[in-house]
């Protein structure tokens, strides 16, 4: 078996491969446009300290939670610890059964 270059047997294939290489090289070696660097102006920079101290419950970043935890026992905690084999409470499904 005689090994030859692909372009020797199929001249059009060699030419199309060469053109493909040229197009890929032109696309990959083209300089990329630089993105404009956005900087924050001096007048928009935030103060390092708050003017008024926050009162109440805040986290490490000084953000107050929207819904703080309620005080006292949770009523659904005992119901959540039921066993699976106990089955559902049918009184919850038929709320008008006591009427």
Curated annotation (Swiss-Prot):
An example Gene Ontology molecular-function term: protein-macromolecule adaptor activity
GO cellular component: endoplasmic reticulum membrane
Gene Ontology terms: biological process: fusion of sperm to egg plasma membrane involved in single fertilization; gene expression; maintenance of protein localization in endoplasmic reticulum; protein N-linked glycosylation; protein stabilization; protein ubiquitination; protein-containing complex assembly; sperm-egg recognition
Source organism superkingdom: Eukaryota
Record keyword Plastid present: no
Pfam families the record matches: Frey (PF15878)
Entry's localization field: Endoplasmic reticulum membrane
Main localization of the protein described in the UniProt heading: endoplasmic reticulum
Keyword terms, alphabetized: Endoplasmic reticulum, Membrane, Transmembrane, Transmembrane helix
Membrane topology: Single-pass type II membrane protein
Annotated spans, Disordered: 65-88
InterPro entries listed in its UniProt record: Frey
Transmembrane segments: 7-29
General function of this protein: Key regulator for male fertility expressed transiently in round spermatids where it recruits IZUMO1 at the endoplasmic reticulum (ER) membrane and coordinates the oolemmal binding multimeric complex (IZUMO1 complex) assembly. Upon complete assembly of the IZUMO1 complex, its ER retention is released, facilitating IZUMO1 complex export to the acrosome. Through the interaction with SPPL2C, inhibits its intramembrane protease activity directly accessing the catalytic center of an I-CLiP.
Subunit and partners: Interacts with SPPL2C (via active sites); the interaction stabilizes FREY1 protein and inhibits SPPL2C proteolytic activity. Interacts with IZUMO1; the interaction retains IZUMO1 at the endoplasmic reticulum membrane and coordinates IZUMO1 complex assembly.
Protein name in the entry: Protein Frey
Organism: Ailuropoda melanoleuca (Giant panda)
Gene: FREY1
């Amino acid at each position: 078996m005689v090994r030859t270059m692909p372009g020797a047997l199929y001249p059009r294939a060699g030419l199309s491969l060469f053109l493909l290489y040229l197009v890929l090289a032109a696309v990959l070696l083209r300089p990329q446009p630089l993105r404009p660097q956005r900087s924050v102006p001096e007048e928009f920079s935030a103060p390092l300290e708050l003017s008024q101290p926050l009162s109440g419950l805040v986290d490490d970043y000084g953000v107050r939670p929207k819904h703080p935890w309620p005080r006292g026992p949770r009523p659904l905690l005992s119901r959540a610890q039921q066993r699976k084999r106990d089955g559902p409470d049918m009184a919850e499904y038929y709320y008008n059964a006591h009427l």
